[in-house]
Amino acid sequence: MMHMTFYWGIKATILFDFWKTDSWLSYILTLIACFVFSAFYQYLENRRIQFKSLSSSRRAPPPPRSSSGVSAPLIPKSGTRSAAKAASVLLFGVNAAIGYLLMLAAMSFNGGVFIAIVVGLTAGYAVFRSDDGGADTATDDPCPCA
């Protein structure tokens, strides 16, 4: 039976039926894995935000206006932008998947797993994202699954 409240034991099932902890060694390895994946989530979020800001800053300047005040062309070329957009979308998808897996791991209601995830997210933010100068104000969300 699955726990519906926080508990503090070493026996836990994380994400899959085959990922069960029944000893201190397996439990500590699980906590380390949760910590590492949480920090990796913040690393990917940082890469995604930096990639997005780089791709938006590389946009070509607008074409010069004609004498009538209309700029041309109406539809910009999208050769390199589509590749950058596809990479950005892929990074977002991987980041979202990791975030949802972290959320599901926290829903095991094991106190140690929950703390390992929160500490991993905090450490990852401190290492990878704390010096980004507020560039992520629109995406600064404490929920790792969004």
Curated annotation (Swiss-Prot):
Where does the UniProt annotation locate this protein? Membrane
Q: Name one GO cellular component term.
A: membrane
The organism encoding this protein is Arabidopsis thaliana
General function of this protein: Involved in the transport of copper.
Region described as Disordered: 55-74
What induces or represses expression of this protein, per its UniProt record?
A: No change in expression levels after treatment with high concentrations of copper.
Q: What is its main location?
A: membrane
Protein name in UniProt: Copper transporter 5
In terms of Pfam families, this protein maps to: Ctr (PF04145)
> Which tissues carry this protein?
Highly expressed in leaves and stems and at lower levels in roots and flowers.
Query: Where do transmembrane segments lie in this chain?
Result: 24-44, 101-121
> Which keywords has UniProt assigned to this entry?
Copper, Copper transport, Ion transport, Membrane, Transmembrane, Transmembrane helix, Transport
The GO terms describing molecular function are: copper ion transmembrane transporter activity
The way it spans or sits in the membrane comes to:
Multi-pass membrane protein
Family to which the UniProt record says this protein belongs? Belongs to the copper transporter (Ctr) (TC 1.A.56) family. SLC31A subfamily.
